[in-house]
């Protein structure tokens, strides 16, 4: 487990923001997949302010999502809606660089549309960087324990939250694993126990998608704050 521990969640998101600056200055478009959750909100707020908002060449960055809930962008549950409110409304970014899951659409229709967009824009299925979170149950994106097909050859899948039954669309495990780089951004004391378990137990003996999903030909890393890493 390749872990980097930061003093606070803010330090972790500052590091990611600094890397956005570097990625944005490459001489080709860069495809980044974002995550929902509380720590990414901190990242989006940080990116929307100086110095990052000015230093980043937004025209070069294309944004996607690991998953989203099937709700309209105005719904507080929408991962895309959060980024729009906290980041996109505050910067100049071309509309065509934003590749959202359209949560207001009928799920099967949207699944097909989203897969077509993915195939057209990233024909080899290789993302430059996928930023993921992890729930206390070990899920990542909307890939939940005991209900994820790790061999699904599709690009995306309709998923149902095991408790609320809420419908989402998620990238598949296989698509995520093709990325050049996967960063799990995990913060807070509530994640300490499961991180310890992932560090000390072979992934094949665990039900957690976050323990199993790793970049096949790239880098997999865990950005943690001190609270999350306290048992490691």
Regions found by a protein language model. Name each.
Residues 1-32:
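N-terminal glycine-/serine-/threonine-rich phosphate-binding loop
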Residues 26-51:
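Glycine-rich N-terminal segment of FAD-binding domains in flavoprotein oxidoreductases
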Residues 34-39, 132-136, 187:
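Glycine-rich beta-strand-to-loop/alpha-helix junction loops that act as flexible
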Residues 46-56, 81, 145-153, 201:
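A glycine- and small-aliphatic-rich helix-loop capping segment at beta-alpha/alpha-beta transitions
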Residues 56-131:
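Ligand-binding beta-strand-loop-alpha-helix segment within the catalytic cores
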Residues 111-112, 141-146, 194-198:
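A short secondary-structure junction signal
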Residues 130-174:
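Class I SAM-dependent methyltransferase SAM-binding "motif I" and its flanking Rossmann-like core
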Residues 180-232:
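ATP/nucleoside-binding phosphotransfer catalytic cores, i.e., glycine-rich phosphate-binding loops
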């Amino acid at each position: 487990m390749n872990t980097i521990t930061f003093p606070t969640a803010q330090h972790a998101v500052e590091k990611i923001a600094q890397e956005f600056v570097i990625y944005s200055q490459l001489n080709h478009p860069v495809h980044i997949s974002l995550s929902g959750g509380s720590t990414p909100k901190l990242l989006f707020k940080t990116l929307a302010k100086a110095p990052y908002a000015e230093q980043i060449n937004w025209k070069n960055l294309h944004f996607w999502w690991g998953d989203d809930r099937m709700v309209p962008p105005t719904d507080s549950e929408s991962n895309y809606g959060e980024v729009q409110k906290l980041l996109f409304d505050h910067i100049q970014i071309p509309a065509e660089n934003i590749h959202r899951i359209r949560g207001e659409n009928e799920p099967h229709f949207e699944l097909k549309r989203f897969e077509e967009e993915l195939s057209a824009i990233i024909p080899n299925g290789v993302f430059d960087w996928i930023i993921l979170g992890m729930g206390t149950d070990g899920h990542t994106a909307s890939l939940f324990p005991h209900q994820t097909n790790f061999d699904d050859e599709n690009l995306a899948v309709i998923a149902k939250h095991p408790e609320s039954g809420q419908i989402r669309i998620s990238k598949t495990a296989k698509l995520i694993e093709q990325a050049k780089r996967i960063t799990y951004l995990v913060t807070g004391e509530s994640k300490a126990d499961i991180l310890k378990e992932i560090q000390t137990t072979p992934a094949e003996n665990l039900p957690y998608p976050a323990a199993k999903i790793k970049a096949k030909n790239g880098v997999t890393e865990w950005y943690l704050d001190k609270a999350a890493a306290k048992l490691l």
